[in-house]
Amino acid sequence: MDPQQKGLVNTCFVTTRIPSWAGARQNVTGSDLEGKPVPSDVLESGRPLAAPRIRTLYEEQQLNMLAVNVLLDELKIQVAAMQNSVTAIQREVNDLKQRIARD
């Protein structure tokens, strides 16, 4: 390796850090071939991009839990209605049994 190129990595891989004099910009938002934004590898705070993804996953799970809780509340209402129906049917059956026993 040439001593004047101290700190440079010579490799065939595109993922090598290219020196700034070559026009490379590290950790900045750019765009892909289709013009869509490409986020930086490192956020301003120095945290990796995985941190917001975890937060997003957590938020999605919270939304899913809200939906599950709504469904559970609906099921509780349906179960209560069914219990009331069963109680009413049991009363009718008991009344019929008492009428049959009297006769």
Curated annotation (Swiss-Prot):
Keyword Endoplasmic reticulum appears in the UniProt entry: no
| UniProt induction comment | Expressed in the intermediate phase of the viral replicative cycle.
Give UniProt keywords alphabetically: Capsid decoration protein, Capsid protein, Coiled coil, Host nucleus, Host-virus interaction, Virion, Virus entry into host cell
Instruction: Tell me the domain of life.
Output: Viruses
InterPro entries documented for this protein: Hexon_assoc_IX
Q: GO MF annotations for this entry? A: hexon binding
Q: Name one GO cellular component term.
A: viral capsid, decoration
- Gene Ontology BP term (one): symbiont entry into host cell
The principal location of this protein is virion
Localized where? Virion; Host nucleus
Q: Which residues form a coiled coil?
A: 72-99
User: Briefly, what is this protein's role?
Assistant: Structural component of the virion that acts as a cement protein on the capsid exterior and forms triskelion structures consisting of three molecules that stabilize three hexon trimers at the center of each icosahedral facet and fixes the peripentonal hexons. Dispensable for assembly. During virus entry, recruits the anterograde motor kinesin-1 to the capsid docked at the nuclear pore complex thereby subjecting the docked capsid to a pulling force.
Sequence similarity: Belongs to the adenoviridae hexon-interlacing protein family.
Read off the domain note: Three N-terminal domains of hexon-interlacing protein form triskelions between hexon capsomers.
* Remaining remarks: This protein is only encoded by mastadenoviruses, and may therefore play a role in mammals tropism.
Query: Subunit info?
Result: Homotrimer. Interacts with hexon protein; this interaction tethers the hexons together. Self-interacts with adjacent proteins. Interacts with kinesin light chain KLC1; this interaction leads to capsid disruption at the nuclear pore complex during virus entry into host cell.
For this entry, the protein name equals: Hexon-interlacing protein
Say which species the protein is native to.
Canine adenovirus serotype 2 (strain Toronto A 26-61)
